[in-house]
């Protein structure tokens, strides 16, 4: 049994529901481009970052929630009016953030295991 809960969601509404269902818990969220039927994202940086982020998951604090969110297809993501950009102020994928704080890693920063681990382990 792992010490954190992982939740996979697709799209903004599912993300919001996952967050509201876990009110009061510390939440880390990873946003990635949608995956195709072969499990490969249209976003090459997401493909590169995911194994780095996953390798650091054991460092998540006990009792936290890790939400893996697919943001949609490329045309949806590129639309500057999508809810992820408008409401969550995301600027790129992949993005790893500590929900409710200004802490986030964007794009190439997610390739760096030391930065990912620092986000998971520092208060």
UniProtKB/Swiss-Prot annotation:
<feature type="active site" description="Nucleophile">
    <location>
        <position position="46"/>
    </location>
</feature>
<dbReference type="InterPro" id="IPR045108">
    <property type="entry name" value="TXNDC17-like"/>
</dbReference>
<feature type="domain" description="Thioredoxin">
    <location>
        <begin position="41"/>
        <end position="123"/>
    </location>
</feature>
<feature type="site" description="Contributes to redox potential value">
    <location>
        <position position="44"/>
    </location>
</feature>
<keyword id="KW-1015">Disulfide bond</keyword>
<feature type="site" description="Contributes to redox potential value">
    <location>
        <position position="45"/>
    </location>
</feature>
<comment type="function">
    <text>Disulfide reductase. May participate in various redox reactions through the reversible oxidation of its active center dithiol to a disulfide and catalyze dithiol-disulfide exchange reactions. Has peroxidase activity and may contribute to the elimination of cellular hydrogen peroxide.</text>
</comment>
<dbReference type="GO" id="GO:0047134">
    <property type="term" value="F:protein-disulfide reductase [NAD(P)H] activity"/>
</dbReference>
<comment type="similarity">
    <text>Belongs to the thioredoxin family.</text>
</comment>
<dbReference type="GO" id="GO:0005829">
    <property type="term" value="C:cytosol"/>
</dbReference>
<dbReference type="InterPro" id="IPR036249">
    <property type="entry name" value="Thioredoxin-like_sf"/>
</dbReference>
<dbReference type="InterPro" id="IPR010357">
    <property type="entry name" value="TXNDC17_dom"/>
</dbReference>
<feature type="disulfide bond" description="Redox-active">
    <location>
        <begin position="43"/>
        <end position="46"/>
    </location>
</feature>
<feature type="active site" description="Nucleophile">
    <location>
        <position position="43"/>
    </location>
</feature>
<keyword id="KW-0676">Redox-active center</keyword>
<protein>
    <recommendedName>
        <fullName>Thioredoxin domain-containing protein 17</fullName>
    </recommendedName>
</protein>
<dbReference type="Pfam" id="PF06110">
    <property type="entry name" value="TXD17-like_Trx"/>
</dbReference>
<keyword id="KW-0963">Cytoplasm</keyword>
């Amino acid at each position: 049994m792992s010490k954190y809960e992982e939740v996979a969601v697709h799209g903004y509404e599912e993300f919001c529901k996952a967050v509201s269902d876990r009110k009061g818990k510390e939440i880390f969220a990873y946003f990635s481009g949608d995956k195709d039927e072969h499990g490969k994202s249209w976003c090459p940086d997401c493909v590169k970052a995911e194994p780095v982020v996953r390798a650091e998951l054991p460092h998540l604090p006990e009792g936290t929630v890790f939400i893996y969110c697919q943001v949609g297809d490329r045309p949806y993501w590129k639309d500057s009016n999508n809810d992820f950009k408008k409401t969550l102020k995301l600027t790129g994928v992949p993005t790893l953030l500590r929900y409710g704080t200004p802490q986030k890693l964007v794009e190439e920063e997610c390739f760096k295991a030391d930065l990912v681990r620092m986000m998971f382990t520092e208060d």
